[in-house]
């Protein structure tokens, strides 16, 4: 890992809050091209599921056992570590779910998604067949019970059940909208000032991109970034847990990686990566302050985002469009959303 990248990732957590995050993750002075890729395909019909293979490759097979030392002549081999797999493979397991409107990978340790992938188009957002009032938060029975985030974990926790794929992005179908309410699509998020405010404005920005681009793909997920302890000047990863007993991790930050496609075969893709702290953010804070090098998100998350896209097809999103939010009060936004049903 380069010293520059370490500094970017570490410094983003050195001081809590939006200002420090934005300052440390800033692209100012960084002329490197964003290193990501996303295959450009014709926008599917709104009701069609998005295959995981469009964004991420299939997980690699379990590694083969290392060669063992030669056994003594005429005797049994000394050890057989892979014999343990007769009783079960320990993992880790990433629960991959393909929904009608998104694909997600679930982290059994934190009880949050690793990532969620969605695809929005002008056509998909123009249909209002889903009614949020008919959707309910539900536990995901596809996740083994002992690894599952539960409704009671969020009860009186002080955190919102924060959608990673927004319900408003899947309003073209009631079933698709309902699937966004699985707890496997949620993370604990600060409510006032973030989930109900700045984060919601950010989601709206993503939807508004479809006025300029015919196809927009978005990867969203949590981060758990280190912070320097002033007592000993060392770096620690520290985050709250909710639930009784503690069960669900509270992310320190959230990322979005945006692929805005021009719709042409082999055409350009405008890429934008953003990291926001899980904290109250003033509505007058410029969105572009949270723009980061994509490599920083990859280093911090341990993920790679579509590395098959040639460099010559990549454009910087915020150089191609106005990266800014439009502020709407929560009550006004909910009322407006309800009228569209």
Segments predicted by a language model, with ranges:
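Domain-level detector for secreted/extracellular nuclease and nuclease-toxin modules, and
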Residues: 2-341
């Amino acid at each position: 890992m380069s010293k520059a990248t370490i500094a970017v990732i570490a410094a983003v957590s050195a001081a809590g809050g939006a200002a420090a995050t934005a300052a440390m993750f800033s692209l100012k002075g960084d002329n490197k091209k964003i290193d990501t890729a996303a295959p450009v395909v014709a926008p599917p019909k709104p009701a069609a599921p998005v295959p995981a293979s469009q964004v991420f490759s299939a997980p690699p097979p379990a590694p083969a056992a290392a060669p063992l030392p030669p056994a003594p002549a005429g005797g049994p081999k000394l050890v057989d570590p892979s014999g343990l797999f007769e009783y079960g493979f320990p993992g880790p397991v990433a629960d991959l779910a393909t929904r009608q409107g998104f694909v997600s990978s679930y982290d059994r340790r934190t009880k949050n998604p690793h990532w969620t992938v969605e695809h929005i188009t002008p056509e998909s957002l123009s249909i209002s067949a889903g009614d949020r009032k008919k959707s309910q938060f539900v536990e995901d029975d596809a996740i083994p019970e002992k690894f599952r985030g539960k409704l009671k974990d969020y009860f009186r926790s002080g955190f919102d059940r924060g959608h990673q794929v927004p319900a408003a992005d899947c309003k073209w179908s009631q079933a698709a909208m309902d699937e966004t309410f699985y707890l496997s699509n949620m993370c604990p998020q600060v409510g006032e000032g973030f989930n109900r405010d700045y984060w919601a404005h950010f989601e709206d920005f993503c939807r508004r991109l479809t006025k300029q681009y015919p196809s927009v793909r978005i990867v969203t997920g949590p981060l758990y970034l280190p912070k320097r302890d002033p007592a000993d000047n060392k770096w620690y990863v520290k985050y709250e847990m909710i639930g009784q007993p503690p069960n669900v991790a509270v992310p320190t930050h959230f990322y979005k990686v945006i692929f805005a496609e021009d719709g042409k075969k082999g055409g350009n893709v405008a890429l934008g990566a953003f990291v926001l702290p899980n904290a109250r953010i003033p509505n007058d804070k410029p969105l572009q302050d949270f723009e980061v090098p994509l490599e920083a998100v990859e280093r911090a998350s341990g993920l790679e985002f579509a590395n098959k896209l040639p460099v010559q097809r990549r454009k910087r999103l915020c150089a191609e469009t106005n990266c800014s939010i439009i502020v709407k009060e929560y009550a006004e936004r909910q009322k407006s959303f309800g009228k569209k049903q």
